[in-house]
Amino acid sequence: MNESVTVRGKDRYKSGVMEYKKMGYWEPDYEPKDTDVIALFRVTPQDGVDPIEASAAVAGESSTATWTVVWTDRLTAAEKYRAKCYRVDPVPNSPGQYFAYIAYDLDLFENGSIANLSASIIGNVFGFKPLKALRLEDMRLPVAYVKTFQGPATGIVVERERMDKFGRPLLGATVKPKLGLSGRNYGRVVYEALKGGLDFTKDDENINSQPFMHWRERFLYCMEAVNKAQAASGEIKGTYLNVTAGTMEDMYERAEFAKQLGSVIIMIDLVIGYTAIQSMAKWARKNDMILHLHRAGHSTYTRQRNHGVSFRVIAKWMRLAGVDHIHAGTVVGKLEGDPATTRGYYDICREDHNPMALEHGVFFEQNWASLNKLMPVASGGIHAGQMHQLLDHLGEDVVLQFGGGTIGHPMGIQAGATANRVALEAMILARNEGRDYLHEGPEILAKAAQTCTPLKAALETWKNVTFNYESTDMPDYAPTPSVSV
């Protein structure tokens, strides 16, 4: 169906139930304005439901419609405020699924509010009965809207200047085990990892303030470790102090204490909510702190291919919200991450302008209006033996976090950190010399290991570790398998 079937005039406002496509929510001749917010949904209608009607219903229920005609529509600029589904395409190789392109007038959204944006776009509509499933695949955010957000508080360029580290990925590690350590032992892990050559250590998502270690105790021991490691190495170091708590008041208190102790970075979890994230981002900018976001909980709605919200959308929202770091996948690690899809995530974080790239799952051109760049973080099941693959897939503007790959080293934590640092330095040197480091990677690492016993032990310990599983979320226009490690 390529023509409009909208009912016009008085008949449009007769009491009763009317199909969404006849109420003005299906407008195939509509040309989106530069100022429109555009959303791409993957729509899976119930059996027997017209895909055009299902898509129009998504447009209606995410903007101005309800289940019946209401006369109060005539008191508004209804033609302007209705979301308009203007294109519906079958999803390649996915029978019964459709891509619905929906345009929203900018006036429907509050400036600078992810909470308001998400309340409309992913509000009630995801529970709509005529749909088997619904997924928000991508969004085009107009420049006029983007400029109402502050963007990353620090950004990649200023972070590198603050850390005095250039020309290579940054190295980190999540403290393990994530729960159960005392404050003193936790601080010892931080010191060993930083002294061994890492740039950062990190709290995990669920370490907050528990009986075995109060948050204040952790902060004190961690910052003591950071200061000692800086003195020993002559390098600037940091540890992501997780300020996530039950209330905003508690989070502000913890962030202020981290600042008083001299930390360069704090951390929050995605589960605190969009408004809390934006609030902490504003605090971080005001107080010159780097803000790390752990994407805890995201896979509950980003992983399934037919229902939920794509992580590329979450990445866009978080760049608007103003965090400086976000976990964005590893390609070769233990967590979900198709190579092409992950490339799309990284481009969203790091580029000033994103062209449409269907092969990476990016459906719209996106102008970031000079917002700072967001540093992606790769963590989860990576080790020194993958350094050539990580550098090739992810580039240099990334934090590579080797948690188990540092703390699980057979010679100890400091040796694990040294192994990762030497592997990275060897690979960067090979890259700068113009070598084909991706294909020569194993040879480069083996040569470096001849003069670095910790690296030799790491390569031997994890040489057979693979996470070769097919990804559940891949670009529909360029299906690719997960990378074999």
Swiss-Prot record:
- Modification N6-carboxylysine, positions: 202
Question: Which SUPFAM superfamilies does the record match to this protein?
Answer: RuBisCo, C-terminal domain (SSF51649), RuBisCO, large subunit, small (N-terminal) domain (SSF54966)
Q: What is its EC number?
A: 4.1.1.39
Q: Which reaction does it catalyse?
A: 2 (2R)-3-phosphoglycerate + 2 H(+) = D-ribulose 1,5-bisphosphate + CO2 + H2O; D-ribulose 1,5-bisphosphate + O2 = 2-phosphoglycolate + (2R)-3-phosphoglycerate + 2 H(+)
The cross-references to InterPro entries, in alphabetical order and at most eight, read: RuBisCO, RuBisCo_large_chain_AS, RuBisCO_lsu_C, RuBisCO_lsu_C_sf, RuBisCO_lsu_fd_N, RuBisCO_lsu_N_sf, RuBisCO_lsuI
The alphabetical list of record keywords is:
Calvin cycle, Carbon dioxide fixation, Lyase, Magnesium, Metal-binding, Monooxygenase, Oxidoreductase, Photosynthesis
Q: Positions of the site: Transition state stabilizer? A: 334
Q: Specify whether GTP-binding is a keyword of the entry.
A: no
Give the co-factor note: Binds 1 Mg(2+) ion per subunit.
Superkingdom of the source species: Bacteria
Q: Known Pfam families for this protein?
A: RuBisCO_large, RuBisCO_large_N
Residues recorded as binding Mg(2+), renumbered to this chain, are: 202, 204-205
One Gene Ontology molecular-function label: ribulose-bisphosphate carboxylase activity
Cofactor or coenzyme needed: Mg(2+)
Which residues are substrate-binding? 124, 174, 178, 295, 327, 379
According to its UniProt entry, one GO biological process term is: reductive pentose-phosphate cycle
User: Which residues does the Swiss-Prot or TrEMBL record annotate as the active site?
Assistant: 176, 294
Database matches in CDD domains:
RuBisCO_large_I
Listed under subunit, the entry gives:
Heterohexadecamer of 8 large chains and 8 small chains.
Q: Which family does it belong to?
A: Belongs to the RuBisCO large chain family. Type I subfamily.
Give the protein's function: RuBisCO catalyzes two reactions: the carboxylation of D-ribulose 1,5-bisphosphate, the primary event in carbon dioxide fixation, as well as the oxidative fragmentation of the pentose substrate. Both reactions occur simultaneously and in competition at the same active site.
Which NCBIfam families does this entry report, sorted A to Z? PRK04208.1 (NF003252)
Further remark: The basic functional RuBisCO is composed of a large chain homodimer in a 'head-to-tail' conformation. In form I RuBisCO this homodimer is arranged in a barrel-like tetramer with the small subunits forming a tetrameric 'cap' on each end of the 'barrel'.
Which named protein is this?
Ribulose bisphosphate carboxylase large chain
Identify the species of origin.
Rhodopseudomonas palustris (strain BisA53)
Taxonomic lineage of the native organism: Bacteria, Pseudomonadati, Pseudomonadota, Alphaproteobacteria, Hyphomicrobiales
